[in-house]
């Protein structure tokens, strides 16, 4: 069997070239504060891949996506090893657009910090009197530039996103910026409405898009996972403070309260983190993870 090497390795994913397609492996690595931790979180990669598959299937009436298959039998022999099962996706090749498409339905995190200062989030003025974790009257689109690994993404205004896209696609900056904004909000609205019926609030999330060979907009990367989104339990939701969440907040909190930790988590924190990921997956999909 031929040993294959990834053509690109991110903090969590490995990308392999498969001729006319790509193969994307979500590893069990976990990153916090842009640092890859020494621990691996068993089943995390499978949660990311299978949850993305669920959302891709749910939203294909709104926009096509890059997923071809998550069945390793459809892939080269190298990916039929046990270690790739459940966490591997064969995808269409896309020309990725240089914008991270962030949508916020609730005010929290960096958005809340910004609002407290001047009543705006990423340059968008919001109503007075909002409390932390309040639902916004309408979801807001707050794009950012895509940074190289090790750098931070930079929040930009909608107008700046037009200029940024214009550099890559002369004469099409506004058209693509509007398409990204409208698609992002439409996807968020459908998925947030669905998640609420399953007891989960999607406070905010991030999408990435690319163009196929015909120039059509296609959803790429991952979709609505605990790595790219804030999921809150609807039960007990109460504005006025932060909310418990189904993500790596356990890990972040432990690292913050234990300086000099060498970027290694105790097993108890690893176990709590994956329990949250699995709980979110099971609530949203209605089934146990098969991996």
Regions flagged by a language model, labelled:
Residues 1-148, 261-291:
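Active-site loop/lid in soluble adenylation, ligation, and acyl-transfer enzymes
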Residues 21, 96-98, 199-202, 214-217:
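Coil-to-beta-strand transition motifs
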Residues 33, 112-113, 214, 228-230:
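Intrinsically disordered, low-complexity acidic/polar segments
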Residues 103, 202-223:
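Conserved metal-phosphate-binding beta-hairpin within the catalytic cores
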Residues 117-118, 125-175, 219, 223-284:
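Anionic ligand-binding catalytic core segments
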Residues 171-203:
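A long amphipathic alpha-helix within ATP-dependent nucleotide-binding catalytic cores
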């Amino acid at each position: 069997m031929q040993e294959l090497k990834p053509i690109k390795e991110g903090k969590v994913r490995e990308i392999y070239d498969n001729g006319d397609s790509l193969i994307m492996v979500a590893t069990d690595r976990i990153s916090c504060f842009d640092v890859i931790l020494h621990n691996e979180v068993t089943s995390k990669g499978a949660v990311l891949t299978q949850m993305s598959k669920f959302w891709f299937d749910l939203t294909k009436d709104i926009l096509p996506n890059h997923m071809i298959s998550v069945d390793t039998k459809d892939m080269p022999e190298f990916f039929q090893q046990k270690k790739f099962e459940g966490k591997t996706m064969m995808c269409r090749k896309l020309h990725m657009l240089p914008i991270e498409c962030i949508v916020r339905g609730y005010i929290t995190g960096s958005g809340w910090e910004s609002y407290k200062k001047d009543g705006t989030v990423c340059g968008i003025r919001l109503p007075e009197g909002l409390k932390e974790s309040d639902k916004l009257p309408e979801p807001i689109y707050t794009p950012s530039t895509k940074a190289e690994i090790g750098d931070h993404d930079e929040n930009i205004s909608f107008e700046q996103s037009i200029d940024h896209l214009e550099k890559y696609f002369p004469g099409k900056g506004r058209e693509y910026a509007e398409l990204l904004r409208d698609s992002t909000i439409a996807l968020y609205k459908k998925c947030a409405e669905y998640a609420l019926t399953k007891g989960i609030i999607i406070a905010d999330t991030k999408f990435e898009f690319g163009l196929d060979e015909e120039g059509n907009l296609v959803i790429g990367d991952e979709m609505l996972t605990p790595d790219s989104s804030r999921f809150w339990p609807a039960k007990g939701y109460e504005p006025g403070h932060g909310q418990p969440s189904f993500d790596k907040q356990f890990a972040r909190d432990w690292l913050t309260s234990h300086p000099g930790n060498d970027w290694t988590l105790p097993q108890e924190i690893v176990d709590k983190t994956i329990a949250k990921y699995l709980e979110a997956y099971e609530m949203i999909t209605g089934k146990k993870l098969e991996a």
